[in-house]
Design a protein with these regions (language model features):
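Hydrophobic core segments of alpha-helical transmembrane domains in multi-pass membrane transport
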Residues: 7, 14, 45, 50-54, ...
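Structural signature of hydrophobic alpha-helical transmembrane segments
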Residues: 4-19, 68-83, 135-147
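C-terminal ends of transmembrane helices
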Residues: 23-37, 85-99, 151-162
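Generic transmembrane alpha-helix signature in multi-pass membrane proteins
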Residues: 22-30, 89-95, 104-107, 114-127
Length: 201
């Protein structure tokens, strides 16, 4: 149980997928202008990321490893993720049109979100079992959502203040992203302390 708590805390704060591992930068910068849109994107990513990790883990263990096709991992995972996003989009459109309308614009963007592919590969590299993979994927999605929503809040506040001409646009956005990254660096070493505390070291 403690091992899963460690994975959960580490994935959200210590090794945040965006601010520490620099995956998913495109949606982080592109969909973070408003809190509403960032929450919608976060929900869509959480759903697809968790589902994609389960499917890609099963593909790796029961297809690629069994038939010695590990060299096809990246292309296989990309195809699985793209197919999964399309399937989710079709199902949502039929089952829940309201939810489809809310997330519709974000779902196609998830296919190109490198964080989804990155997490799928990371769980294989870390040799996680299926439950650990699910916990890691969901925790990573929460970490992504947290970073995205906090950053959207910062950008909304920046709209209310007068920024010097030379710092307007992407300059202040990149500076704010850097400061947010530095804030999350304050969590570095927490996972090591928790390992000792939980007796996992």
């Amino acid at each position: 149980m403690m091992e899963y708590i460690l994975i959960f805390i580490s994935a959200i704060f210590v090794n945040n997928i965006v601010l520490s591992q620099f995956l998913g930068i495109c949606p982080f910068l592109g969909v973070s202008k408003k809190i509403d849109t960032s929450l919608g994107m976060s929900a869509a990513v959480a759903f697809v990321l968790t589902l994609a990790t389960i499917v890609t883990w099963l593909v790796q263990k029961y297809v690629l490893d069994v038939f010695g096709l590990q060299y096809l991992q990246t292309i296989a995972f990309i195809l699985v993720i793209a197919s999964l996003v399309q399937m989710v989009e079709i199902v949502l459109k039929k089952v829940s049109p309201a939810l489809y309308q809310a997330l519709g614009i974000f779902l196609p963007l998830i296919t190109t979100n490198c964080a989804v592919l990155g997490v799928a590969i990371l769980v294989i590299q870390k040799d996680f079992n299926l439950l650990q993979s699910v916990v890691y994927a969901f925790s990573t999605a929460i970490g992504f959502g947290l970073a995205l929503t906090v950053f959207a809040g910062i950008r909304e506040q920046l709209e209310l203040v007068k920024i010097p001409k030379g710092m307007q646009g992407m300059a202040i956005v990149m500076l704010s992203a850097g400061l947010l990254s530095l804030a999350f660096m304050g969590f570095s070493g927490v996972d090591g302390g928790l390992k000792v505390l939980f007796g996992l070291d």
